[in-house]
């Protein structure tokens, strides 16, 4: 038996035609542009048309105008510096350059000893001047302030014996005592006599203390009334004044 033949081409053609009609409608509809962008675009078109109507386009700029624009561009850094007060105004035909020599070629041997084995044939400069960097020169004033601050914080006499320092030492907490006074106190307690911190029985020699006190003129003491240094005495040995008082009483 023969089956009935079904024709399918007619339905496919109708579907294809329907798709083509939808595409044509989409192409014919203009895209939706937001109102803000549309306004900006209209302003740009208006300005371009005005420039074209005046004949002042990009291709019609005169040579004088180009030169003026170039001069204004070159002088812009100078004008900014002038307005900020960094330096005085200079002409556009003047350029100033500053070269900083951070490593001067100075002969090290001649500077340290005054003698160089190469003699006059040395390629380095024979100079014994003191060269310092700019930041070092700017910090020279801090040296005096540091010493004055140290003098303010250091008592001009020993806190334990109330006398002048003999073989001064410096504790870990930064306080100064006589060497003998500190040794005798450590046998009793390790706490600092000034702040009460634990010194652990350790102290360093304070060699710069004598220089600081001499620079500060003893903080009110004249050099004449400064007694000569006495050697540290043992814990059981009496002082010289005590011996005299004992002899007078006897």
From Swiss-Prot:
The keyword Nucleus applies. One of its GO terms (biological process) is generation of catalytic spliceosome for first transesterification step. The keyword Signal does not apply. SUPFAM superfamilies: CCCH zinc finger, RING/U-box. It holds the Pfam family zf-CCCH. PROSITE patterns: ZF_C3H1 (PS50103), ZF_RING_2 (PS50089). Involved in pre-mRNA splicing. Belongs to the CWC24 family. Associated with the spliceosome. This is Pre-mRNA-splicing factor CWC24. The gene is CWC24.
């Amino acid at each position: 038996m023969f089956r009935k033949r079904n024709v399918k081409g007619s339905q496919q053609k109708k579907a294809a035609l329907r798709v083509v009609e939808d595409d044509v409608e989409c192409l014919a509809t203009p895209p939706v542009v937001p109102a803000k962008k549309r306004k900006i675009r209209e302003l740009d078109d208006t300005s371009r048309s005005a420039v074209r109507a005046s004949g002042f386009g990009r291709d019609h700029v005169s040579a004088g105008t180009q030169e003026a624009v170039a001069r204004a561009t070159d002088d812009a850094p100078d004008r900014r510096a002038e307005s900020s007060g960094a330096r005085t105004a200079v002409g556009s035909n003047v350029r100033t350059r500053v070269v900083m020599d951070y490593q001067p070629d100075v002969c090290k041997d001649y500077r340290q000893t005054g003698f160089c084995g190469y003699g006059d044939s040395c390629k380095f400069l024979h100079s014994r001047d003191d060269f310092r960097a700019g930041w070092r020169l700017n910090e020279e004033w801090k040296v005096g302030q540091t010493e004055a601050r140290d003098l303010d914080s250091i008592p001009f006499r020993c806190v334990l014996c109330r006398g002048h320092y003999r073989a001064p030492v410096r504790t870990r907490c930064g306080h100064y005592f006589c060497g003998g006074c500190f040794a005798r106190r450590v046998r009793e307690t390790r706490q600092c006599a000034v702040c009460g911190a634990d010194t652990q029985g350790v102290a360093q020699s304070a060699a710069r203390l004598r220089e600081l006190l001499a620079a500060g003129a003893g903080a009110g003491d004249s050099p004449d009334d400064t007694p000569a240094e006495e050697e540290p005495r043992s814990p059981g040995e009496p002082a010289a004044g005590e011996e005299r008082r004992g002899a007078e009483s006897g």
